[in-house]
Amino acid sequence: MPESYTRDPKRVEKTLREKGVVVVMGRDHAKTPQDVINTVRGIYEAGLIAEVTFRIHEGVLKEDMSELRKRRAEAQRSHPGNPMLLGVGSVINPRELEAAIEMGFDMIVGPDSGMGGCRERIDFVKIVRAAKCFGVPGAFSPSEFAYFLEREDGLEPDGIKIFNASVYGPSGMGALLAPYQRERHNGKMVMPTGGVNLKTAAGFQEQISKRGFCPIL
């Protein structure tokens, strides 16, 4: 990463809370390296946050990040109140996690609660925290959600992704979160992924907010 830019999880958190929407990019959005750069730029200019994924060829991501890091540093200098955050998702093993950190992403998102190859599920949180990245591991079941939410070791992740949210739908998402309504969890970020679209977004937002959590769609 250029020395002119320093990763800051608090900057990511503040921006996520302000914007509330992350636009996920898959392989279909990246026919060429320039496609990724143009799409990320367009998402940023629209006032949202872009998340590329490791479904895109890693070589393409590396090439793109060389340019995107420069644009991010420039945006930070010229518009410090509107940072260009670079997120990456579909990170499924320690090698991809280390690659994401090395490439300079601000936010790293995993689709499941147990990253293949890690000794313990919580290793994801330890690694991203040490790298000063904003980390969001995935969960699906109540036990997986509680594993990250209810910790006494101070290793709660920055947010928790619920995948595949289409299985729950908005009302089911509310039912999943209801038992965990506690004052200490107020404002904790929950990111439903899968089945979130123009028809369902408002429902997910309402159900998550009603349970005291902060919805990031």
Predicted regions and their residues:
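Anionic-ligand binding region
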Residues: 143-153, 160, 170-179
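Alpha-helix-loop-beta-strand connector modules within alpha/beta enzyme cores
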Residues: 58-90, 120-141, 171-197
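Catalytic cores of alpha/beta
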Residues: 93-103, 142-154, 196-215
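Active-site-adjacent loop and "lid" segments of alpha/beta metabolic enzymes
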Residues: 109, 192, 205-206
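Conserved N-terminal beta1-alpha1 strand-loop-helix module at the mouth
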Residues: 1-103, 206
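Active-site pocket-lining/capping segments in soluble small-molecule metabolic enzymes
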Residues: 3-11, 191-193, 197-201, 212-217
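Catalytic beta/alpha-barrel core
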Residues: 24-28, 48-58, 83-93, 105-119, ...
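Generic hydrophobic/aromatic pocket-lining and core-packing "Φ" positions
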Residues: 36-40, 65, 97, 121-125, ...
